[in-house]
Curated annotation (Swiss-Prot):
Official protein name in the record: Sugar transport protein MST5
Keyword Transmembrane helix tagged: yes
Membrane topology: Multi-pass membrane protein
GO cellular component: membrane
One MF annotation (Gene Ontology) recorded for this entry: symporter activity
Tissue note: Expressed in panicles before heading. Expressed in flowers before pollination.
All ranges on the Cytoplasmic side of the membrane: 1-18, 102-110, 150-167, 224-295, 343-357, 408-426, 473-519
Topology Extracellular: residue spans: 40-80, 128, 189-202, 317-321, 379-386, 448-451
Major place of residence: membrane
Keywords annotated in UniProt: Membrane, Sugar transport, Symport, Transmembrane, Transmembrane helix, Transport
Family annotation (InterPro entries): MFS_dom, MFS_STP/MST-like_plant, MFS_sugar_transport-like, MFS_trans_sf, STP/PLT_plant, Sugar/inositol_transpt, Sugar_transporter_CS
Length: 519
Protein backbone atom coordinates (compact mmCIF):
# COMPACT_ATOMS: atom_id res chain seq x y z
CA UNK A 1 0.00 0.00 0.00
CA UNK A 2 1.20 3.47 -0.68
CA UNK A 3 2.25 5.61 2.20
CA UNK A 4 4.74 8.17 3.43
CA UNK A 5 8.25 7.30 2.31
CA UNK A 6 10.01 9.26 5.06
CA UNK A 7 9.04 10.03 8.62
CA UNK A 8 10.31 13.35 9.99
CA UNK A 9 11.19 13.44 13.67
CA UNK A 10 11.19 16.33 16.06
CA UNK A 11 14.89 15.89 16.56
CA UNK A 12 15.56 16.28 12.85
CA UNK A 13 16.01 12.62 11.93
CA UNK A 14 14.23 10.77 9.19
CA UNK A 15 13.35 7.10 9.16
CA UNK A 16 12.85 5.64 5.67
CA UNK A 17 9.73 3.58 5.21
CA UNK A 18 6.21 3.46 3.84
CA UNK A 19 2.80 2.07 4.62
CA UNK A 20 3.06 -1.55 3.51
CA UNK A 21 0.29 -4.06 2.96
CA UNK A 22 1.92 -6.26 5.58
CA UNK A 23 1.84 -3.67 8.37
CA UNK A 24 -1.74 -2.78 7.43
CA UNK A 25 -2.74 -6.44 7.71
CA UNK A 26 -1.01 -6.96 11.04
CA UNK A 27 -2.58 -3.83 12.50
CA UNK A 28 -5.98 -4.85 11.16
CA UNK A 29 -5.76 -8.27 12.81
CA UNK A 30 -4.47 -6.80 16.08
CA UNK A 31 -7.22 -4.19 16.05
CA UNK A 32 -9.76 -7.00 16.15
CA UNK A 33 -8.95 -7.08 19.86
CA UNK A 34 -11.28 -4.11 20.02
CA UNK A 35 -14.11 -6.36 18.82
CA UNK A 36 -14.24 -8.22 22.13
CA UNK A 37 -14.33 -4.95 24.07
CA UNK A 38 -16.99 -3.38 21.87
CA UNK A 39 -19.16 -6.47 21.57
CA UNK A 40 -19.43 -6.74 25.31
CA UNK A 41 -20.31 -3.06 25.71
CA UNK A 42 -23.16 -3.46 23.24
CA UNK A 43 -24.47 -6.87 24.25
CA UNK A 44 -24.69 -6.28 28.00
CA UNK A 45 -27.03 -3.29 27.68
CA UNK A 46 -29.24 -5.13 25.23
CA UNK A 47 -29.79 -8.30 27.24
CA UNK A 48 -30.48 -6.33 30.43
CA UNK A 49 -33.42 -4.69 28.65
CA UNK A 50 -34.93 -8.04 27.56
CA UNK A 51 -37.93 -9.24 29.56
CA UNK A 52 -36.90 -12.90 29.34
CA UNK A 53 -33.43 -12.18 30.76
CA UNK A 54 -34.71 -9.93 33.55
CA UNK A 55 -37.51 -12.28 34.59
CA UNK A 56 -35.10 -15.23 34.86
CA UNK A 57 -32.20 -13.57 36.68
CA UNK A 58 -33.50 -10.26 38.07
CA UNK A 59 -37.23 -10.71 38.82
CA UNK A 60 -37.46 -7.67 41.11
CA UNK A 61 -36.06 -5.42 38.38
CA UNK A 62 -38.48 -7.00 35.90
CA UNK A 63 -41.38 -6.10 38.18
CA UNK A 64 -40.15 -2.50 38.44
CA UNK A 65 -39.69 -2.26 34.67
CA UNK A 66 -43.30 -3.28 34.11
CA UNK A 67 -44.63 -0.68 36.53
CA UNK A 68 -47.15 1.92 35.40
CA UNK A 69 -46.10 5.01 33.49
CA UNK A 70 -47.43 6.94 36.49
CA UNK A 71 -44.44 5.78 38.55
CA UNK A 72 -40.97 7.34 38.58
CA UNK A 73 -39.37 6.32 35.27
CA UNK A 74 -35.89 7.36 36.40
CA UNK A 75 -35.71 4.62 39.04
CA UNK A 76 -37.33 1.59 37.47
CA UNK A 77 -34.04 -0.16 36.59
CA UNK A 78 -32.18 0.85 39.76
CA UNK A 79 -30.53 -2.37 40.99
CA UNK A 80 -26.99 -2.84 42.27
CA UNK A 81 -27.08 -6.53 41.34
CA UNK A 82 -28.09 -5.70 37.77
CA UNK A 83 -25.32 -3.13 37.42
CA UNK A 84 -22.86 -5.61 38.95
CA UNK A 85 -23.63 -7.94 36.04
CA UNK A 86 -22.37 -5.24 33.69
CA UNK A 87 -19.60 -3.64 35.72
CA UNK A 88 -17.98 -6.77 37.23
CA UNK A 89 -16.17 -7.22 33.92
CA UNK A 90 -14.31 -3.95 34.40
CA UNK A 91 -13.32 -4.75 37.96
CA UNK A 92 -11.74 -7.96 36.66
CA UNK A 93 -10.03 -6.03 33.85
CA UNK A 94 -8.66 -3.59 36.43
CA UNK A 95 -7.08 -6.38 38.47
CA UNK A 96 -5.78 -8.10 35.33
CA UNK A 97 -4.02 -5.03 33.93
CA UNK A 98 -0.99 -5.51 36.19
CA UNK A 99 -0.56 -9.20 35.31
CA UNK A 100 -1.14 -8.37 31.65
CA UNK A 101 1.66 -5.79 31.76
CA UNK A 102 4.08 -8.48 32.96
CA UNK A 103 2.95 -10.96 30.30
CA UNK A 104 3.20 -8.28 27.62
CA UNK A 105 6.76 -7.47 28.65
CA UNK A 106 8.11 -10.98 29.25
CA UNK A 107 6.35 -12.97 26.53
CA UNK A 108 5.53 -10.27 23.99
CA UNK A 109 2.51 -8.37 22.74
CA UNK A 110 1.08 -11.16 20.61
CA UNK A 111 0.91 -13.70 23.43
CA UNK A 112 -0.81 -11.19 25.67
CA UNK A 113 -3.43 -10.77 22.94
CA UNK A 114 -3.72 -14.56 22.73
CA UNK A 115 -4.33 -14.84 26.48
CA UNK A 116 -7.04 -12.22 26.18
CA UNK A 117 -8.78 -14.09 23.39
CA UNK A 118 -8.73 -17.45 25.19
CA UNK A 119 -10.13 -16.14 28.48
CA UNK A 120 -12.79 -14.11 26.68
CA UNK A 121 -13.78 -17.26 24.78
CA UNK A 122 -14.21 -19.16 28.05
CA UNK A 123 -16.25 -16.34 29.56
CA UNK A 124 -18.61 -16.16 26.59
CA UNK A 125 -19.28 -19.91 26.81
CA UNK A 126 -20.07 -19.66 30.52
CA UNK A 127 -22.41 -16.70 30.04
CA UNK A 128 -24.26 -18.31 27.16
CA UNK A 129 -24.92 -21.41 29.28
CA UNK A 130 -25.66 -19.54 32.54
CA UNK A 131 -28.41 -20.86 34.80
CA UNK A 132 -28.02 -18.44 37.73
CA UNK A 133 -26.61 -15.00 38.55
CA UNK A 134 -23.33 -16.39 39.92
CA UNK A 135 -22.60 -18.13 36.61
CA UNK A 136 -23.31 -14.86 34.83
CA UNK A 137 -20.94 -12.88 37.04
CA UNK A 138 -18.21 -15.56 36.89
CA UNK A 139 -18.47 -15.45 33.11
CA UNK A 140 -18.23 -11.66 33.23
CA UNK A 141 -15.07 -11.92 35.32
CA UNK A 142 -13.47 -14.18 32.68
CA UNK A 143 -14.55 -11.71 30.01
CA UNK A 144 -12.93 -8.95 32.08
CA UNK A 145 -9.65 -10.82 32.22
CA UNK A 146 -9.75 -11.04 28.43
CA UNK A 147 -10.47 -7.33 28.11
CA UNK A 148 -7.63 -6.53 30.51
CA UNK A 149 -5.12 -8.41 28.36
CA UNK A 150 -6.42 -6.97 25.09
CA UNK A 151 -6.51 -3.37 26.29
CA UNK A 152 -2.97 -3.65 27.64
CA UNK A 153 -1.40 -5.21 24.55
CA UNK A 154 -3.31 -4.03 21.48
CA UNK A 155 -2.70 -0.25 21.76
CA UNK A 156 1.00 -0.91 22.39
CA UNK A 157 1.19 -3.30 19.46
CA UNK A 158 -0.40 -0.81 17.09
CA UNK A 159 1.78 2.11 18.23
CA UNK A 160 4.93 0.05 17.85
CA UNK A 161 4.15 -1.39 14.41
CA UNK A 162 2.93 1.82 12.77
CA UNK A 163 5.11 4.43 11.01
CA UNK A 164 5.12 7.65 13.03
CA UNK A 165 3.23 9.65 10.41
CA UNK A 166 0.41 7.08 10.34
CA UNK A 167 0.45 5.99 13.96
CA UNK A 168 -2.78 7.80 14.79
CA UNK A 169 -4.72 6.28 11.90
CA UNK A 170 -3.58 2.72 12.56
CA UNK A 171 -3.94 2.98 16.33
CA UNK A 172 -7.52 4.18 15.98
CA UNK A 173 -8.20 0.89 14.21
CA UNK A 174 -8.63 -0.47 17.75
CA UNK A 175 -11.42 2.02 18.43
CA UNK A 176 -13.01 1.35 15.03
CA UNK A 177 -13.15 -2.35 15.81
CA UNK A 178 -14.64 -1.48 19.18
CA UNK A 179 -17.44 0.44 17.46
CA UNK A 180 -18.00 -2.42 15.01
CA UNK A 181 -18.29 -4.74 18.00
CA UNK A 182 -20.85 -2.43 19.62
CA UNK A 183 -22.88 -2.18 16.41
CA UNK A 184 -22.78 -5.94 15.84
CA UNK A 185 -24.00 -6.53 19.38
CA UNK A 186 -26.82 -4.01 18.96
CA UNK A 187 -27.96 -5.71 15.76
CA UNK A 188 -27.86 -9.13 17.43
CA UNK A 189 -29.83 -7.79 20.40
CA UNK A 190 -32.48 -6.45 18.04
CA UNK A 191 -32.66 -9.70 16.05
CA UNK A 192 -32.81 -12.04 19.06
CA UNK A 193 -35.12 -10.05 21.33
CA UNK A 194 -38.26 -11.42 19.69
CA UNK A 195 -37.26 -15.10 19.58
CA UNK A 196 -40.09 -17.21 20.96
CA UNK A 197 -39.23 -19.08 24.12
CA UNK A 198 -37.22 -16.21 25.59
CA UNK A 199 -33.76 -17.66 25.01
CA UNK A 200 -32.52 -15.04 22.55
CA UNK A 201 -30.25 -13.53 25.20
CA UNK A 202 -28.25 -16.78 25.25
CA UNK A 203 -27.39 -16.29 21.58
CA UNK A 204 -26.22 -12.74 22.22
CA UNK A 205 -24.02 -13.67 25.17
CA UNK A 206 -22.68 -16.83 23.52
CA UNK A 207 -21.78 -15.10 20.25
CA UNK A 208 -19.17 -13.11 22.17
CA UNK A 209 -17.05 -16.15 21.38
CA UNK A 210 -16.84 -15.09 17.73
CA UNK A 211 -14.70 -11.94 18.24
CA UNK A 212 -12.76 -13.86 20.90
CA UNK A 213 -11.94 -16.56 18.34
CA UNK A 214 -10.84 -13.95 15.80
CA UNK A 215 -8.27 -12.34 18.10
CA UNK A 216 -7.14 -15.75 19.43
CA UNK A 217 -6.40 -17.15 15.97
CA UNK A 218 -5.10 -13.80 14.75
CA UNK A 219 -2.56 -13.61 17.56
CA UNK A 220 -1.12 -16.96 16.48
CA UNK A 221 -0.20 -15.67 13.01
CA UNK A 222 0.96 -12.15 13.92
CA UNK A 223 4.65 -11.30 14.29
CA UNK A 224 5.63 -9.58 17.49
CA UNK A 225 6.80 -5.97 17.34
CA UNK A 226 10.47 -5.15 16.69
CA UNK A 227 10.57 -3.26 19.98
CA UNK A 228 9.36 -6.24 21.98
CA UNK A 229 11.69 -8.64 20.14
CA UNK A 230 14.72 -6.44 20.85
CA UNK A 231 13.77 -6.10 24.51
CA UNK A 232 13.50 -9.89 24.82
CA UNK A 233 16.83 -10.59 23.11
CA UNK A 234 15.69 -11.48 19.58
CA UNK A 235 17.59 -8.75 17.75
CA UNK A 236 17.89 -10.63 14.46
CA UNK A 237 14.18 -11.37 14.32
CA UNK A 238 13.46 -7.76 15.22
CA UNK A 239 15.42 -6.42 12.28
CA UNK A 240 13.73 -8.80 9.85
CA UNK A 241 10.29 -7.73 11.09
CA UNK A 242 11.28 -4.06 10.88
CA UNK A 243 12.41 -4.47 7.27
CA UNK A 244 9.14 -6.18 6.42
CA UNK A 245 6.83 -3.63 8.06
CA UNK A 246 8.72 -0.60 6.71
CA UNK A 247 9.01 -1.98 3.17
CA UNK A 248 12.70 -1.11 2.84
CA UNK A 249 16.09 -2.54 3.78
CA UNK A 250 17.24 0.90 4.95
CA UNK A 251 16.11 0.60 8.56
CA UNK A 252 19.51 0.95 10.22
CA UNK A 253 18.88 4.29 11.94
CA UNK A 254 15.50 3.32 13.30
CA UNK A 255 16.79 -0.08 14.39
CA UNK A 256 19.82 1.44 16.12
CA UNK A 257 17.59 3.88 17.98
CA UNK A 258 15.36 1.01 19.10
CA UNK A 259 18.39 -0.92 20.37
CA UNK A 260 19.74 2.14 22.19
CA UNK A 261 16.36 2.76 23.77
CA UNK A 262 16.07 -0.87 24.80
CA UNK A 263 19.51 -0.85 26.40
CA UNK A 264 18.67 2.25 28.39
CA UNK A 265 15.35 0.78 29.45
CA UNK A 266 17.04 -2.45 30.53
CA UNK A 267 19.19 -0.45 32.95
CA UNK A 268 16.07 0.78 34.75
CA UNK A 269 15.36 -1.57 37.65
CA UNK A 270 12.34 0.14 39.18
CA UNK A 271 10.09 1.67 36.51
CA UNK A 272 7.15 1.89 38.93
CA UNK A 273 9.31 4.04 41.19
CA UNK A 274 10.89 5.97 38.32
CA UNK A 275 7.55 7.00 36.85
CA UNK A 276 7.16 9.21 39.93
CA UNK A 277 10.28 11.21 39.02
CA UNK A 278 9.74 14.86 38.18
CA UNK A 279 10.75 14.47 34.52
CA UNK A 280 7.94 11.95 33.98
CA UNK A 281 5.29 14.11 35.62
CA UNK A 282 3.66 15.07 32.29
CA UNK A 283 3.31 11.45 31.16
CA UNK A 284 2.03 10.33 34.57
CA UNK A 285 -0.55 13.11 34.53
CA UNK A 286 -1.71 12.10 31.05
CA UNK A 287 -1.82 8.40 32.04
CA UNK A 288 -4.19 9.24 34.87
CA UNK A 289 -6.33 12.08 33.55
CA UNK A 290 -6.96 11.12 29.90
CA UNK A 291 -8.56 7.72 30.66
CA UNK A 292 -10.29 9.25 33.69
CA UNK A 293 -11.76 12.02 31.56
CA UNK A 294 -12.71 9.53 28.85
CA UNK A 295 -15.03 7.75 31.25
CA UNK A 296 -16.34 10.99 32.76
CA UNK A 297 -17.72 11.90 29.34
CA UNK A 298 -20.43 9.41 30.29
CA UNK A 299 -20.14 7.53 27.01
CA UNK A 300 -19.85 4.02 28.36
CA UNK A 301 -23.02 4.31 30.39
CA UNK A 302 -24.76 5.45 27.21
CA UNK A 303 -23.34 2.45 25.36
CA UNK A 304 -23.81 -0.04 28.25
CA UNK A 305 -27.32 0.98 29.03
CA UNK A 306 -28.55 2.49 25.75
CA UNK A 307 -31.59 0.18 25.46
CA UNK A 308 -32.29 0.53 29.20
CA UNK A 309 -31.93 4.31 28.95
CA UNK A 310 -34.27 4.49 25.98
CA UNK A 311 -36.78 2.30 27.81
CA UNK A 312 -36.51 4.59 30.83
CA UNK A 313 -37.37 7.69 28.81
CA UNK A 314 -40.38 6.14 27.18
CA UNK A 315 -39.37 4.04 24.15
CA UNK A 316 -41.02 0.68 23.55
CA UNK A 317 -38.87 -2.46 23.73
CA UNK A 318 -38.13 -2.85 20.02
CA UNK A 319 -37.79 0.91 19.59
CA UNK A 320 -35.22 1.10 22.37
CA UNK A 321 -33.10 -1.62 20.75
CA UNK A 322 -33.40 0.00 17.32
CA UNK A 323 -32.36 3.36 18.79
CA UNK A 324 -29.28 1.63 20.19
CA UNK A 325 -28.54 0.31 16.69
CA UNK A 326 -28.78 3.86 15.34
CA UNK A 327 -26.33 5.20 17.92
CA UNK A 328 -24.04 2.27 17.13
CA UNK A 329 -24.04 3.18 13.44
CA UNK A 330 -23.26 6.81 14.25
CA UNK A 331 -20.47 5.66 16.55
CA UNK A 332 -18.85 3.53 13.84
CA UNK A 333 -19.03 6.07 11.00
CA UNK A 334 -17.84 8.93 13.20
CA UNK A 335 -14.82 6.82 14.19
CA UNK A 336 -13.95 6.57 10.49
CA UNK A 337 -13.88 10.38 10.44
CA UNK A 338 -11.28 10.25 13.20
CA UNK A 339 -9.17 7.72 11.29
CA UNK A 340 -9.12 10.01 8.26
CA UNK A 341 -8.41 13.22 10.15
CA UNK A 342 -6.29 12.39 13.21
CA UNK A 343 -2.93 12.51 11.39
CA UNK A 344 -3.99 15.54 9.34
CA UNK A 345 -5.75 17.79 11.85
CA UNK A 346 -3.95 16.49 14.91
CA UNK A 347 -5.07 15.29 18.32
CA UNK A 348 -5.83 18.68 19.88
CA UNK A 349 -8.25 19.84 17.18
CA UNK A 350 -10.33 16.68 17.51
CA UNK A 351 -10.27 16.82 21.31
CA UNK A 352 -11.41 20.44 21.40
CA UNK A 353 -14.08 20.19 18.70
CA UNK A 354 -15.45 16.90 20.00
CA UNK A 355 -15.49 18.13 23.59
CA UNK A 356 -17.45 21.25 22.65
CA UNK A 357 -19.97 19.24 20.64
CA UNK A 358 -20.44 16.74 23.46
CA UNK A 359 -20.96 19.51 26.03
CA UNK A 360 -23.70 21.13 23.97
CA UNK A 361 -25.37 17.78 23.27
CA UNK A 362 -25.39 16.74 26.93
CA UNK A 363 -26.96 20.03 27.99
CA UNK A 364 -29.67 19.74 25.33
CA UNK A 365 -30.43 16.08 26.17
CA UNK A 366 -30.72 16.90 29.87
CA UNK A 367 -33.00 19.83 29.11
CA UNK A 368 -35.25 17.81 26.79
CA UNK A 369 -35.66 15.08 29.41
CA UNK A 370 -36.30 17.69 32.12
CA UNK A 371 -39.03 19.35 30.08
CA UNK A 372 -40.73 16.03 29.40
CA UNK A 373 -40.38 14.14 32.70
CA UNK A 374 -39.49 16.84 35.22
CA UNK A 375 -38.29 15.87 38.68
CA UNK A 376 -41.09 13.37 39.30
CA UNK A 377 -40.07 11.21 36.33
CA UNK A 378 -43.66 10.76 35.18
CA UNK A 379 -44.69 11.20 31.57
CA UNK A 380 -44.58 9.91 28.00
CA UNK A 381 -42.95 11.19 24.81
CA UNK A 382 -44.45 11.84 21.42
CA UNK A 383 -42.77 10.30 18.38
CA UNK A 384 -41.37 13.65 17.19
CA UNK A 385 -40.00 14.45 20.65
CA UNK A 386 -38.33 11.03 20.83
CA UNK A 387 -36.70 11.55 17.42
CA UNK A 388 -35.34 14.91 18.55
CA UNK A 389 -33.88 13.33 21.69
CA UNK A 390 -32.21 10.52 19.73
CA UNK A 391 -30.79 13.10 17.31
CA UNK A 392 -28.95 14.94 20.08
CA UNK A 393 -27.79 11.68 21.66
CA UNK A 394 -26.35 10.78 18.25
CA UNK A 395 -24.61 14.16 18.06
CA UNK A 396 -23.08 13.41 21.45
CA UNK A 397 -21.97 9.93 20.36
CA UNK A 398 -20.47 11.32 17.13
CA UNK A 399 -18.48 13.92 19.05
CA UNK A 400 -17.08 11.20 21.29
CA UNK A 401 -16.35 8.83 18.41
CA UNK A 402 -13.99 11.23 16.63
CA UNK A 403 -12.36 12.62 19.77
CA UNK A 404 -12.30 11.13 23.25
CA UNK A 405 -13.14 7.61 22.05
CA UNK A 406 -10.07 6.84 19.92
CA UNK A 407 -7.78 9.51 21.38
CA UNK A 408 -8.41 8.32 24.91
CA UNK A 409 -6.49 5.17 23.96
CA UNK A 410 -4.11 6.63 21.38
CA UNK A 411 -2.58 9.49 23.36
CA UNK A 412 -1.62 7.50 26.49
CA UNK A 413 -0.12 4.75 24.31
CA UNK A 414 2.22 7.13 22.48
CA UNK A 415 3.56 9.56 25.10
CA UNK A 416 5.63 7.38 27.43
CA UNK A 417 9.40 7.07 27.49
CA UNK A 418 10.51 3.48 26.94
CA UNK A 419 11.84 2.88 30.42
CA UNK A 420 8.44 3.57 32.01
CA UNK A 421 6.19 2.57 29.16
CA UNK A 422 4.70 -0.66 30.45
CA UNK A 423 4.15 0.88 33.88
CA UNK A 424 2.53 3.91 32.27
CA UNK A 425 0.25 1.87 30.03
CA UNK A 426 -0.76 -0.26 33.00
CA UNK A 427 -1.72 2.87 34.92
CA UNK A 428 -3.76 4.14 31.96
CA UNK A 429 -5.62 0.83 31.57
CA UNK A 430 -6.09 0.55 35.33
CA UNK A 431 -7.58 4.04 35.63
CA UNK A 432 -9.82 3.44 32.61
CA UNK A 433 -11.17 0.17 33.98
CA UNK A 434 -11.57 1.55 37.51
CA UNK A 435 -13.61 4.55 36.34
CA UNK A 436 -15.60 2.34 33.97
CA UNK A 437 -16.48 0.06 36.88
CA UNK A 438 -17.38 2.89 39.25
CA UNK A 439 -19.51 4.82 36.76
CA UNK A 440 -21.09 1.68 35.34
CA UNK A 441 -21.98 0.45 38.82
CA UNK A 442 -23.33 3.82 39.92
CA UNK A 443 -25.13 4.93 36.74
CA UNK A 444 -28.63 3.57 37.32
CA UNK A 445 -28.58 4.78 40.92
CA UNK A 446 -27.30 8.19 39.79
CA UNK A 447 -30.07 8.34 37.18
CA UNK A 448 -32.60 7.56 39.90
CA UNK A 449 -31.34 10.31 42.24
CA UNK A 450 -29.96 12.97 39.88
CA UNK A 451 -32.65 12.40 37.25
CA UNK A 452 -32.13 14.67 34.21
CA UNK A 453 -29.36 16.40 36.19
CA UNK A 454 -27.14 13.41 35.44
CA UNK A 455 -26.63 14.75 31.91
CA UNK A 456 -25.66 18.15 33.33
CA UNK A 457 -23.19 16.34 35.60
CA UNK A 458 -21.41 14.83 32.60
CA UNK A 459 -21.64 18.13 30.70
CA UNK A 460 -19.79 19.82 33.56
CA UNK A 461 -16.97 17.32 33.24
CA UNK A 462 -16.85 18.01 29.51
CA UNK A 463 -16.02 21.64 30.31
CA UNK A 464 -13.26 20.57 32.69
CA UNK A 465 -11.59 18.12 30.31
CA UNK A 466 -11.82 20.39 27.26
CA UNK A 467 -10.15 23.16 29.25
CA UNK A 468 -7.43 20.74 30.35
CA UNK A 469 -6.70 19.74 26.75
CA UNK A 470 -6.58 23.38 25.64
CA UNK A 471 -4.05 24.30 28.32
CA UNK A 472 -1.98 21.22 29.06
CA UNK A 473 -1.98 18.70 26.19
CA UNK A 474 0.68 19.32 23.51
CA UNK A 475 0.22 18.16 19.92
CA UNK A 476 1.80 14.75 19.25
CA UNK A 477 0.78 14.38 15.59
CA UNK A 478 3.58 12.87 13.49
CA UNK A 479 6.08 12.72 16.36
CA UNK A 480 8.02 9.42 16.50
CA UNK A 481 7.65 7.95 19.96
CA UNK A 482 11.43 7.84 20.36
CA UNK A 483 11.42 11.66 20.12
CA UNK A 484 8.41 12.42 22.34
CA UNK A 485 10.47 14.07 25.12
CA UNK A 486 11.05 17.05 22.83
CA UNK A 487 7.32 17.75 22.85
CA UNK A 488 7.16 17.98 26.63
CA UNK A 489 10.33 20.05 26.95
CA UNK A 490 8.93 22.73 24.60
CA UNK A 491 5.52 23.00 26.26
CA UNK A 492 4.78 26.22 28.16
CA UNK A 493 3.91 24.35 31.37
CA UNK A 494 5.55 20.92 31.16
CA UNK A 495 8.85 22.41 30.03
CA UNK A 496 9.61 23.18 33.68
CA UNK A 497 9.46 19.44 34.41
CA UNK A 498 11.24 18.06 31.33
CA UNK A 499 14.51 19.92 30.93
CA UNK A 500 17.00 20.08 28.07
CA UNK A 501 19.20 17.71 30.09
CA UNK A 502 16.37 15.15 30.21
CA UNK A 503 15.93 15.36 26.43
CA UNK A 504 19.65 15.02 25.82
CA UNK A 505 19.76 12.09 28.21
CA UNK A 506 17.08 10.36 26.21
CA UNK A 507 19.39 10.40 23.23
CA UNK A 508 18.29 8.72 20.10
CA UNK A 509 16.23 6.10 21.79
CA UNK A 510 15.93 6.68 25.49
CA UNK A 511 12.99 8.98 25.12
CA UNK A 512 11.24 6.35 23.11
CA UNK A 513 7.81 5.15 23.78
CA UNK A 514 7.57 2.15 21.54
CA UNK A 515 8.10 -0.55 24.06
CA UNK A 516 7.02 -1.62 27.51
CA UNK A 517 10.18 -3.49 28.39
CA UNK A 518 9.96 -3.07 32.14
CA UNK A 519 6.97 -3.30 34.41
Amino acid sequence: MAGGAMVQTVGGKTYPGKMTAFVFFTCLVASSGGLIFGYDIGISGGVTSMDSFLSEFFPSVYAQAKASKDTNQYCKFDSQLLTLFTSSLYLAALATSFVAAWVTRVFGRKWSMFCGGVTFLAGSALNGAATDVMMLILGRILLGIGVGFANQSVPLYLSEMAPANLRGMLNIGFQLMTTIGILSANLINYATSSIEGGWGWRIGLGLAGVPALIITLGALVLPDTPNSLIARGYAGDAKRVLVKIRGTDDVHDEYDDMVAASEEAASIEHPWRNILHRKYRPQLTIAILIPCFQQLTGINVIMFYAPVLFLTIGFAGDASLMSAVITGLVNMFATVVSIISVDRLGRRVLFLQGGTQMFISQVVVGTLIALQFGVAGVGEMSRSYAILLVLFICMYVAGFAWSWGPLGWLVPSEVFALEIRSAGQSIAVCVNMMLTFVIGQAFLTMLCHLKFGLFYFFAGWMLVMTTFVALFLPETKGVPIEEMNHVWSRHWFWGSYVTAHDVAGAGAGGGGNRRSHNV
